[in-house]
């Protein structure tokens, strides 16, 4: 203990070099912060930030002002008042950010949180992002990813949500992908509830499930099915295969290969209940 009011209680090769610094025990620990840095124990831990704290573990560093590493190994807190609870190789880079545990997780935006898992990133841009767990997930400004694998909630104007699944992406403001695989909601308040390779690319659009369904105009709905396409505006497809709703307020309940007229002058408000290869005639 080399600084005023500093103390090393026990252990070996410990150093308390900051004003009012404290090392409780362990081996090779250093408390060097400007004021009141603390290392309770463990091995090769460093508290270098003002009033920084390391509880234990191995190779942990609390470098931010008032930052905390509770335990684990090779964890780092760089942001002021940031926290890493445990795990390994986690980094809380920014102000008031938290990594609770897991491995190789990182918070890049202020007030962001990673609960656990592996290789997750909260707020690669912006702040207030949350990744609860999973693997390889990313959340940006005010975005939320619950879990799963390789999901992203990356809206530039906030509030994108992906609770789970694999390879899903919510990129529009207030957009949601509930789960499934390789689904995308790309516009404001667009939603894909589940399924596989579905695309809600316009504002206020909705895909319930199924596979390879695509919405191209605002306010459209595809409840399910496969390879259906809605491009009408407030149009609806219930389910089925290779259905196409092409004009405003068109409805196709189901079936296979059914399509409505695409003429914007004479089409619209068409209805096909089901069947196969049915077509509504424009102006009829």
Region locations from a protein language model:
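Periodic small-residue-enriched repeat registers in elongated scaffold domains
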Residues: 1-284
